[in-house]
Structure formats: C-alpha cells, structure tokens
From Swiss-Prot:
The gene is COR28. It comes from Arabidopsis thaliana. The lineage of its organism: Eukaryota, Viridiplantae, Streptophyta, Embryophyta, Tracheophyta. It is found in: Nucleus. GO terms for biological process: negative regulation of DNA-templated transcription; regulation of circadian rhythm; regulation of photoperiodism, flowering; response to abscisic acid; response to absence of light; response to blue light; response to cold; response to red light. Induction: Regulated by the circadian clock at warm growth temperatures as direct targets of CCA1, with highest levels from noon to dusk. Repressed by CCA1 at the transcription level via chromatin binding and in a temperature-dependent way. Induced by cold. Induced by abscisic acid (ABA). Transcription is repressed by blue and red lights, but induced by darkness; by contrast, present at low levels in darkness but accumulates in blue light (at protein level) due to transcription auto-repression. This is Cold-regulated protein 28.
Length: 218
C-alpha cells in the first residue's frame, strides 16, 4: 500500500510538472504570437501612413489645379451676381481675345456687361488740337459784338480726347484769355487817349484870341 501511494504521488508530481511546462510553452507561444501580431500591425499602419502621405502630398500640379479651380469658381460667382451665365462667359473670352488683337479697342465692364470702347489714335487728337488753333486764330480777327465780347464758335469733335491735348487746350485757352484782357486794356487806353486829344482840340477851337485893333494912319 505504501508503495502504491508513493507511485501515485510521483505520478501526480510528474503530471503537474508536465502541465506546468505545457502551460509555460503555451504562454510563451502566445506571447510570441502577440508580439508578431503587434509588429505586423505597426508595419501595416506605417505602410498605410506612407500611402496616405503620398496621396495627400502638396505638389506643384495640385497647386496649379487648385488655383485654376479658385479662378473659375470666382468668375462663375461674379457672373451669377451680375446676372450673366456661361454663354456670356464664353462670349467675354472671345471678346477679350479679339480685343488684344486690336490696338485701338479696349473691353470694359459697363452696366454689368462687357463692351468694346474705341479710343481714337493720336492723329485724331492732333487734328482736334489743330482745329482748335485754327478757330482761335480766326477768333482774333473777328470783331466784337454789341456787348463787347467775342463770339466763340469752336466745336470739338470726337468722343474721347487725349489727356495731354486737353491740358494743352486748357493752357492755350488760358493764355488766349490773358491776351484778350491785354487787348481790351490796350483798346481802352487808346480810346482814353483819343478822347483826351479830342477834348484838347475842342478846347483850342473854343478859345477866344484877343485881336488888337490897329488904327489906320491918317
């Protein structure tokens, strides 16, 4: 009986050692598997992050496309506010392309729509200035009217005048007014001298010169 009990105890201890060893091996395998899975998860996460960075990287091409998108959206909103549509936008682009070909035509925004405005060349400005000078010279030769003022019949042709020629015309007009004032002052002084001379002559005529009576000799 004692031998049987001893054998049973020894067998139980062996079974316990085997179970402990198997449990340790299982725990080690489980730990290694968890470590491997963690490494795999980290690797997959880093791969996903790198792919996301590649997709969201800001390049020059994306920057240019973004700017084009902003420009087109701004133009669409502008024309929607102005009451225009896509057809007007295409027409505007055609008008702008044609306006660059013409040297004297410019496209401006007036009353909510694009319009062509013709600006005259420098030759038209020269013609206008020469016409103004011609009328000014002819005005000097014209007599005064009943009120003592000169009659101005100058007409400026053309819708748009050059800025420089306008300044020149204003300066010429100012000089002309000064010349008119000087001429009027000269005429007034001449009239006064003429009146003074007339008064002197009338006084001379009205003077009574005493005449000595000479008695004849007998």
């Amino acid at each position: 009986m004692e031998n049987d009990c001893t054998v049973n105890i020894v067998s139980l201890e062996k079974d316990r050692d085997v179970s402990e060893a198997s449990a340790e091996s299982q725990s080690e395998s489980t730990l290694s598997n968890s470590l491997d899975s963690g490494v795999t998860a980290e690797t997959s996460r880093s791969d996903a992050d790198s792919k996301l960075d590649e997709c969201t990287a800001w390049t020059n091409e994306k920057h240019n496309s973004y700017l084009d998108y902003l420009e087109s959206s701004f133009v669409r909103q502008l024309y929607s506010l102005l009451g225009g549509g896509t057809q007007r936008l295409s027409r505007t682009r055609d008008v702008q392309s044609n306006s660059h070909k013409s040297a004297d035509q410019f496209t401006v925004l007036q009353n909510g729509c694009w319009q062509k405005v013709n600006f005259g060349k420098k030759q038209s400005c020269l013609e206008t200035s020469s016409e103004f000078r011609f009328h000014r010279n002819s005005l000097r030769n014209k007599p005064e009217n009943s009120n003592g003022n000169y009659t101005m019949g100058t007409t400026v042709q053309g819708d748009v005048l050059c800025h420089d020629e306008t300044k020149h015309s204003e300066a010429s007009g100012q000089n002309f007014r000064e010349e008119e004032e000087e001429e009027e002052k000269g005429e007034v002084s001449k009239k006064r001298e003429r009146e003074a001379n007339n008064d002197d002559s009338s006084l001379k005529e009205d003077q009574v010169v005493p005449v000595r009576m000479v008695k004849p000799r007998t």
